[in-house]
C-alpha cells in the first residue's frame, strides 16, 4: 500500500486495508486500473476485505472479480472472519473453485501480459479507454475493465443482483460462459460507440466477454 520510485520492479502492491463493503469491490477496480496506469502492473486487493466480516454473497462476488486481477489473494485481519474459500460453506467453495480454475486456464494469457508489462510498461488490468481511445463513452467508465486486449470483465458490486448492464465498445464480443456472439456498434467507426447489453449475473457468474 506504500511504495517509491521503482517499486514495480521487484514487488506486488496491494490496495491496503480495505473493508468488507460492497463499495470496495468498485474501489478495487478503480484503484487497480490507476495503479496499472502508474506503472505498477502487479497489483491487487484483499479478497473479501481485510477489515470486518464478509458475508457469503459478498465474498463470492469478490473472489470472482479478484480472480481476474493481476495479484490475487484472500486475506483478513486477526480479529475477523477467516477469508479462506472453505470458510463460507460448500456453495461459495464451489464458486471459488470455479474462478481459481478459470485463472489457471488463463495463465498462459496472463504470463504473456506480464511479460508485455515488464518490457513496455503496459498495464495488465486496463480501463476500456486504453484499448478504445476513440470511444467517448468509455473515457470515464470504471464499472468494468479489461485484462489485456481480449477480456472484458464486469464485476457485480451490489447485493441481491441477478442481472447487470454491461457496455460493450464497438466490435464483435463473445460471452465466455454461453458463447453468444454480440456485434456492438460499427467496428469500423469506434468513435460512434458500442452499446449496452443486459447480462445474466447470478451469484456464480461474473459477466465476462
Locate predicted features.
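Catalytic-domain carbohydrate-binding cleft regions of carbohydrate-active enzymes
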Residues: 1-207
